[in-house]
Amino acid sequence: MAEQKAKVVHGPGPRGMGGPRPKVENPGKLLKRIMDEVFKHYLPHCILVLVCIIVSALANVQASLFLKTLIDDYIVPMTKQATPDFGPLAGALVRIGCIYAIGVLAAWLNARIMVNVTQGTLRNLRVQLFTHMESLPIRYFDSHPHGDIMSVYTNDVDTLRQMISQSIPQLVSSAITIVSVFTSMCLMSWQLTVVTMLMVALMLFCSKKITSMSGKYFVAQQKDLGKVNGYIEEMMEGQKVVKVFTHEQKALDGFRQLNDKLKESAKQANNYANIIMPVTAQLGNTSYAVCALAGAAMAVGNVGGMTLGTVMAFLSLNKGFNMPISQVSMQANSVIMALAGAERIFKMMDETSEADEGYVTLVNVKYGKDDELVETTERTGIWAWKHPHHDGTTTYHKLAGDITFTDVDFGYVPEKTVLHGINLYGRPGQKIAFVGSTGAGKTTITNLINRFYDIADGKIRYDGINIRKIKKDDLRRSLGIVLQDTHLFTGTVMENIRYGRLDATDEECIAAAKLANADGFVKRLPDGYNTMLTNDGANLSQGQRQLLAIARAAVADPPVLILDEATSSIDTRTEALVQRGMDGLMYGRTSFVIAHRLSTVRNADCIVVLEQGRIIERGSHDELIAKRGKYYQLYTGNLAEN
């Protein structure tokens, strides 16, 4: 079971911060897109950062080169003087101190600017990402695990932060340092430069060899880590079941088995990875020692004009050459990993937004002369569909709540149709109830009314208007929906009710709560309507959460209600309380109701019985009971279960 829920976890690996390099399509295109996001708002900052990096790198090289002058022109001559004059030496030390200070100041300024650039870019990217996510169709969220979407906001954005703030600046700095140091070393001594390059080649060869040996073990480590995380998540979600059946020891044994396997794979992987740094460090020290011995021999033999100052300057450059070489490999891998995260970010941003070809809008109206509908900005409680025409004229059609399905076919995927030839209607003020077995298509029909999905064939009309012509926002504003899975947001009770209509007053929210019969329990909460709700309203019972969801729908005062199994998870006493409130809420409104407890739909104007996506019966409760068909079986079976 844990294996089925295991998630891919990106963790550290042998290549600096991440094991085997992920495969990325079009890395150049991705990198350009990232840099375009950065340069769009921070191009002057980036130019200043580049200047700081160049100044810092050249200051370090210049400081190393100054050692030759310091030793050959100041220290060595002073050793031959009977009474050394320290004045020139002090001046030289001040100059080298200034060089170091300039390098440090440039590095500090670079770091400060990059913090601003990085955080600003990520802020803009998160806003774009969230804005686009809000425009995606429900189908996207149905087909993508929520954990994967969250991972884009957390893991992938964080790897991008590391790349922008650290990896790219260090790569640029390393490249400038390598070029400037290599040029300086060649000008000083080509012989010692050859020795240095041979040791660097050996260093890179050893690193690549060790990395290739550890790669397969890091793949195993990532898989085992995913299994452990999946098992922990599964046990957390099923903790009540574990305790009810007293399977704590069994759960612990299962965890130990997976944890031991993770330990072994991680140990094998890190046995190799942990020796990369010591090996490269020792090879760097070896390069330093070899150059020191060779340089000393050349200086003693006066080969190629080698002096003590030249040897010391070259050794300083040698030390500064090995470090950026190793950094390039590490930071290049970090960039590749960040590009893998960026690929997922941009893939989400490139998803097609929810299409909306509608042009009919919902507006407030009032009656003018001769009972003509006139659009107004006032909240009159009278709504109308504003229908612009090709000839430039506009007509207003009063919203009534008349919904009709004509020969509707639908499938969540093209190759599988789940609704077949659906014909039904809901007249203004009618209560239409959908019943049927699980998977019969009840919820699917309500999803089509609010255009969470678009139909494959047929027509759905709202007050005689094809709903494809109605803008989705306006269509959904005309609907009050209580979903099967109630979701409450972090905030006060009042704020959660007001979510149904953001401009609702406190009095209107309280009136909606009274209509939903939620006012009584809300007043008993510690702070009443100002009680804070967190963690999806975990401090409320399921029934109380359902009542608030109904109040949220009520405050919107919609002409059409969709109640998706609104009382399926409430106890009988609370159900009666809810039902009284719902009867008042549904009065005068077209209502589509789905309920497991068929006793709640007895008073429906029309009961529609669905089976395998087809309407097989319709009529009032008494009519369907008299037929002794599918509804009769469901109803009598439902009563027996209750």
Where are these regions (language model features)?
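An intracellular "coupling" helix at the cytosolic face of ABC transporter transmembrane type-1 domains
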Residues: 40-43, 138-139, 155-164, 168, ...
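Juxtamembrane helix-loop junctions of ABC transporter transmembrane domains
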Residues: 20-28, 51-52, 59-75, 99-146, ...
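Transmembrane helices of ABC transporter permease
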Residues: 41, 45-58, 166-220, 293-306
